[in-house]
A protein has these predicted regions:
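Glycine-rich phosphate-binding loops of nucleotide-dependent enzymes
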Residues: 1-201
Length: 201
């Protein structure tokens, strides 16, 4: 995917769309003959084959992955939305020993963009949110990292139309900021409307 575009990934069930994203992010090992390269803005190439996710982070490669599974993906059930998103900014060196204000301000802006509908949004713990709201938070959490590449696997599966369009808008905003967005989806009409290019597996 190029910077400032949404690349759609489509294919029949079992063709490996989700596995492709897992391989890019280091969650799944590649078979021999495959090659995944991350190209820095200055043109420097970094081979990601077989690289552990933690090694990808240590190299400072700004890859973010929103998985299909909404449960157990690093969200802390007892924390509210802002606190969960702030945890992601801490990982980038914006933690309590450096600057507390920046991650909180960034997290608040992202929460506003997420359009989460729940009473007392700043106090409600994640575990009390609906599945659709949890999915919004998962997308917002990855956006908080200010990634160069944002990957989503079936980000709107099982969600209502309004929630789906909130997520589509978030992905489009990232594209407009120059982020490379890779979107795995099932709805061909959405892929054609949302994506600049589509890769069929």
């Amino acid at each position: 995917a190029m910077g400032g575009e949404i690349l759609g990934i489509a294919g029949i069930a079992g063709s490996g769309q989700k596995e492709l994203l897992e391989s890019i992010s280091g969650l799944q090992k590649l078979e021999a003959g495959s090659k995944i390269t991350y190209i820095e803005p200055d043109g420097t190439e970094c081979l990601l084959n077989g690289m552990d996710p933690l090694d990808i982070i240590r190299k400072g490669l700004l890859l973010s992955f929103v998985p299909e599974d909404r449960f157990g993906m690093g969200l802390v059930g007892g924390m509210n939305i802002i606190q969960n998103i702030m945890l992601r900014t801490y990982r980038r060196g914006k933690g309590p020993l450096t600057d507390r204000k920046f991650p909180r301000d960034l997290s608040q802006k992202i929460v506003d963009d997420l359009e989460v509908v729940t009473p007392d949004i700043n106090r409600t713990p994640i575990r009390r949110l609906s599945g659709g709201n949890v999915q919004k938070v998962l997308v917002g959490r990855e956006i908080a990292q200010n990634p160069a590449v944002l990957m989503t696997a079936y980000a709107v599966r099982g969600l209502d139309i309004n929630t789906s369009y909130v997520i589509y808008n978030l992905l489009t905003e990232q594209k407009m900021k120059g982020v490379s967005v890779i979107y795995v989806g099932e709805d061909l009409d959405v892929l054609l409307e949302l994506c600049d290019r589509i890769l069929v597996l």
